[in-house]
Amino acid sequence: MGLFSKKIHHHEAGQVDKSRLPRHIAIIMDGNGRWAKQRGLPRTAGHKVGAETFRKIATYCKDLGVEYLTVYAFSTENWKRPADEVSTIMALLKQYMLEAIDSMERDQIRLRFLGDLSAISPELQALVDRTNEISSHIHGFQANVCLNYGGRDEILHAARRFARDCADGAAAPEDLTEEGFSSYLYSAGIPDPELIIRTSGEERLSGFLLWQCAYSEFYFCDTLWPDFDSRALDQAIIAYQSRDRRFGGVK
């Protein structure tokens, strides 16, 4: 069975209007450590279950008709965590990249990694390159994994790239637009998320998609990430669909 093909219990969609789904849902997957602590388990156990939750939610998003799912897997600040926890997260990433390489084409799911990938191991970088190569031949649902990612870091990285282009004569400051600047971001080519979800009861972005979230709707829930399921996602989508999105105007 493939990385994203594991079946979950599907329920009636209830009030979800499939004609008004967000194209792009982004999730801050928070609460793995607390989930483990509540059960007397090491934090690493929470990350293992949380990785499985990601696979289930990605499959459900694809089946529902969402086009893009972006998750915050590892931030630029997460290197400060205990070494064994960081090692476990990196080992999980390696495991799921290997599984993805074997199943992406069969499951028709593209996988893209966003962030400063120069800081990860050469082995993981090679696996990222391989998943990118496979994804280039797939059309359809795309799962984006933010790895060694920080919103401010992304904007600085984009600004430096633009500055280099200006110095080389390939760009001019007076010609820069929001759309043009977006092309320098890690997320270039991906539409901004309409809905951003954070689990575990925390109500902050923690540097997630700071440029892209200008008009996103935010949804915060108390559910810890390992317990987040298709019903919880439906509730978030229903809340999103109940809102009046004006984009700075009036109706």
What kind of region is each of these model predictions?
Residues 1-251:
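Flexible, compositionally biased loop and terminal segments
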